[in-house]
């Protein structure tokens, strides 16, 4: 619910509004991928705001790697990646691949929404794990307390994670209302998927595509070799 407002959301929104340079970096990086992630959400009939989750997870960096061994712009750990069909081998890491990781993330989020019945709880479970969220729900219910996200006791990171996501979604929807400016992102595909039918030299591929080698690398981050 993007109309929701409380102190926790406002605190995150204020942080973003005071860090314009961070927003500039994120929107510049997201420009390559956002049309694709939004389009995929639309095709699935899930909230398009979910395409903003990589802003929170990785600042939309498909090469991001965390201390917990999470990788890619959706930050899958190895085990969860395998559950959702992301190949991880010497040649390729599907957690970093834009197409594969987006499919897996939306599969995971849809599954979590089916389990918990709200997108706020689904996002919390994406961050903390479904087990942690379910235990917190059970604890509240046993104590006769509400079991919505805002009433749960969860790890501190998760307690700020959902408000941060909602704050970002509100800023993107109405930046002028909160005193921030955002780089425009073209409402058209930045890339298209091409099957090479086998291995191809990257320099040759870049030449055929009419892009720089660096740009081709940014669009194919899943390849280790």
Where are these regions (language model features)?
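Alpha-helical scaffolds flanking conserved acidic
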Residues: 47-54, 71, 119-124
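Short, surface-exposed glycine/acidic/tryptophan-bearing loops
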Residues: 7, 63-85
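Extracytoplasmic and endomembrane cell-envelope/extracellular-matrix remodeling and assembly machinery
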Residues: 1-39, 43-44, 83, 88-115, ...
């Amino acid at each position: 619910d993007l109309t929701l407002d409380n102190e926790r959301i406002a605190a995150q929104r204020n942080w973003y509004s005071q860090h314009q340079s961070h927003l500039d970096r994120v929107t510049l990086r997201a420009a390559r991928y956002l049309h694709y992630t939004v389009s995929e959400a639309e095709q699935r009939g899930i909230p398009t705001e979910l395409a903003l989750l990589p802003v929170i997870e990785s600042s939309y960096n498909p090469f991001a790697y965390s201390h917990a061994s999470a990788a890619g712009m959706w930050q899958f750990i190895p085990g969860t990646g395998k559950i959702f069909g992301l190949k991880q081998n010497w040649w390729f890491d599907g957690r970093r691949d834009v197409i594969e990781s987006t499919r897996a993330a939306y599969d995971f989020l849809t599954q979590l929404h089916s389990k918990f019945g709200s997108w706020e709880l689904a996002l919390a479970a994406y961050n903390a794990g479904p087990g942690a969220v379910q235990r917190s729900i059970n604890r509240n219910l046993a104590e006769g307390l509400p079991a919505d996200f805002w009433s749960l006791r969860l790890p501190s990171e998760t307690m700020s994670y959902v408000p941060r996501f909602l704050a970002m979604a509100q800023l993107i929807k109405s930046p002028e209302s909160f005193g921030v400016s955002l780089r425009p992102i073209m409402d058209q595909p930045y890339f298209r998927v091409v099957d090479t039918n086998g291995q191809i030299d990257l320099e040759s591929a870049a030449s055929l595509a009419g892009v720089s080698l660096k740009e081709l690398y940014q669009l194919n981050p899943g390849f280790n070799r």
